[in-house]
Regions:
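Short acidic, Pro/Gly- and aromatic-enriched capping/linker segments at domain boundaries
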Residues: 35, 39-50
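Active-site loop segments of alpha/beta catalytic cores
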Residues: 1-34, 60, 84-240
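Cofactor-binding catalytic cores of oxidoreductases
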Residues: 31, 52, 73
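Ligand-binding pocket scaffold of soluble enzyme catalytic domains
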Residues: 55
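Short, surface-exposed, low-complexity cationic segments
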Residues: 61-83
Length: 240
């Protein structure tokens, strides 16, 4: 065990205490204690100008802002099966992660693998958000198949980050919420997103890897009610 700030614990050990809901010696903060390094696959999910690896074109129209998608190439249910999605097996895709992971002290640092844009985001970027919602009513099977194809790539990326780079945590990000509500109904989320989101989680759990899930917006409706009820949480926290 290496010391940090005179304590008999190092940043990695302290971080993992917090993740396991034990009492850390200090509040983990990677900006302060360098406890976390994030590695990313090399699949181009976004760019300032030009086309990403999924066939979506981007432009940065205001230099003080991020780039925005300017086309959504998938415009017909007939395109879903044969649309050329990127191959995650190319050596270029993982080269960035290899280089970063090889330069850190795994005894002192938690290694987090960033899976990239989530199932909802990546799917609506391919087709446009209005079309996503229209298809959820008119062409639900085509939408499910497209999400499935995206998820298959994301699963391969997760498996590679776990088995080849030995990450401790996989980070998934998908913006499901707006300022005051969900972007899609809870029923739609459970129908189209949840089945494959669960498979992404299962890949991590099968390898004893922790999951970090990010979402912008107000998404409390996804969280089972006992976890939002302070009295019940206090009463049953050990069982939860």
């Amino acid at each position: 065990m290496n010391q940090f700030l005179g304590l008999n614990v190092n940043p990695r050990e302290n971080f993992m205490l917090s993740v396991k809901h034990e009492m850390p010696y200090w509040l983990p903060c990677s900006l302060f204690d360098s406890s976390v390094t994030i590695i990313q696959h090399g699949l181009k999910e976004r760019c300032d100008y030009g086309e990403d690896d999924w066939g979506v074109k981007w432009e940065r129209k205001v230099m003080r802002a991020d780039s925005f998608p300017v086309n959504h190439p998938l415009d017909s249910p007939d395109m879903v099966e044969d649309y050329p999605l990127p191959s995650p097996n190319k050596s270029r895709i993982m080269e960035c992660a290899k280089k970063t992971a090889s330069n850190i002290d795994r005894n002192r640092v938690v290694l987090v693998g960033d899976n990239g844009w989530g199932l909802f985001e990546r799917t609506w970027l391919l087709m446009g958000m209005p079309r996503f919602f229209v298809w959820s009513f008119r062409y639900p099977d085509a939408l499910k198949r497209l999400i499935e194809r995206v998820a298959e790539i994301k699963i391969i990326l997760t498996e590679w980050l776990i088995t080849e780079r030995g990450i401790d945590i996989i980070e998934y990000g998908d913006d499901w919420g707006m300022e005051d509500r969900l972007l899609l109904s809870l029923e739609k989320w459970r129908t189209f997103i949840k089945p494959w989101q669960a498979k992404l989680y299962r890949v991590a759990k099968d390898h004893d890897v922790f999951v970090s899930q990010h979402s912008d917006g107000r998404v409390e409706n996804f969280i089972p009610r006992p976890h939002r009820d302070r009295r019940r949480y206090t009463e049953h926290s050990e069982r939860m």
